[in-house]
Amino acid sequence: MHRRLPWLLSCALAACVPAFGLVVAYSPTAGASTAPAHSRPEARALAIARQALRHLDVGQHATDHRVSGSATRVKGLTQVSSTNWAGYADDNTKGNTYSKVTGKWSEPSASCTSATSLAAFWVGIDGYTSASVEQDGTLAECYLGTAYYFSWWEMYPSNAIQVVGESVAPGDRITASVVKSGSRYTLKITDATHSANSFTTTQTCSSCVDTSAEWIAEAPSGSSGVEPLSNFHTWKESSATVKSGSAKGVISTFPDDEITMINSSGATKAKTGSLNSSGNGFTVTWERSS
């Protein structure tokens, strides 16, 4: 079943950049650590790369169809493929709704070419079978051969991606969570390595349906389709938890889908591995950019 591709970039990033000026400086919270000082050219490049993200959304699952082959390793597991997602989603095939999702990872290191590419890593509620996503995570952007890393949140489609931290670095220890209470969603990122990238924000959504929980590596999409996926090598999600009603568990506690990212020809772009023995972790491996 095909779904609408999200409008994630109003134009190709490289084409947008000449129209952008320098971004307004980000002020970390009191007591937060800051990244090392950049030279003026490096600071300008970082500002342009960040400014290009103003038009970026990290949106909903673009396609949903079964991958050939059985999925017998984990009870309740379904294998599907997507043109923009890789990872796991807990769904609502048994009527579940979700109120909390958490995940942990070490920020992957992106290998860049001269081409612009993107890779987003996040946890969230909704988006797998619904039109909204309440999410937060990190993002690797390859721009002119250099990798830039950010922390962000988004209440799709209400707002574009909200970049908070611009000093995320490969190896940073990231914890992400989304918690619902009533119509309020608290989105929190903790960067235990560089605290300037940490944040907590509470947003309101009265129409969100909470019918899925996700742990995802994503290739964002623009007006021309799915953008090239940055070579992040591997992304290892660990210590994932989820809550549905009064039940607390891990990914495998609820009906879960293993999602592999493919291109329009069916070739694998990012391969999702099996859940670990605890049912709370997995690895996504990059295979191609497009």
State the predicted function of each range.
Residues H2-A32:
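Secretory targeting and sorting signals
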Residues A25-Y26, A30-S290:
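Exposed, interaction-prone regions of secreted/extracellular proteins
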